[in-house]
A protein has these predicted regions:
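Conserved Rossmann-fold NAD(P)-dependent oxidoreductase catalytic core, especially the SDR/UDP-sugar
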Residues: 99-141
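N-terminal Rossmann NAD(P)H-binding glycine-rich loop of SDR-like oxidoreductase domains
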Residues: 2-23
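NAD(P)-cofactor binding segment of oxidoreductase domains
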Residues: 14, 18, 85-114
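Conserved glycine-rich Rossmann-like NAD(P)H-binding loop of the short-chain dehydrogenase/reductase
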Residues: 25-37
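SDR active-site strand-loop-helix element
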Residues: 6, 31, 72-78, 113-119
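Short-chain dehydrogenase/reductase
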Residues: 89-91, 95, 129, 140-144
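NAD(P)H-binding glycine-rich loop region in Rossmannoid oxidoreductase-like domains
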Residues: 54-93, 124
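Rossmann-fold cofactor-recognition segment
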Residues: 44-56
Length: 144
């Protein structure tokens, strides 16, 4: 099964790739701004690495068209400090990038898109709460 991981050279993306490989998946593409072999480490020769920007629709279309994934793990995003420093770029990458991934998935008939967010979207004062799909999100930073 072909799998695409946006943000695939990030901390979570690399762990998802590792878990998929350990489960027997063999056709994994990591899509990231800097998917260098140094960044990918021991996964460099086990995944297809594609450089690109999730906030650029052409880049997203190209990688989805080329790889025809059945499943897309959408993990690519700008993190807290850069998002707060440059809100316009954060909107382009995080909001529009998500739209671009969903639209490319629709156009090229990916079976599933799995999206992972951040604890930053829930804000403060959530200790002890069980987080689920109905948990109120109260971000305190632009990133959230």
């Amino acid at each position: 099964m072909a799998t695409l991981i946006t943000g695939g050279a990030g901390f979570v993306g690399l762990e998802v790739a590792r878990q998929l490989l350990d489960a027997g998946e063999t056709e994994i593409t990591v899509f990231s701004r800097n998917p260098s072999s140094g960044r990918l480490g021991d996964l460099a020769d086990r995944v297809n690495a594609v450089a690109g920007d999730v906030g650029n629709f052409s880049h997203v279309l190209d990688v989805v068209k080329a790889t025809r994934p059945e499943v897309i793990y959408h993990l690519g995003a700008m993190l807290t400090v850069p998002s707060d420093a440059d809100p316009a770029s954060a909107i382009q990458t995080n909001a529009m990038g998500t739209f671009y991934v969903l639209e490319a998935a629709r156009l090229f008939e990916a079976r599933q898109v799995i999206f992972s967010s951040s604890i930053g979207s829930y804000g403060r004062n959530i200790e002890g709460e069980t987080l689920n799909d109905t948990t109120l999100q109260r971000p305190t930073m632009f990133y959230g």
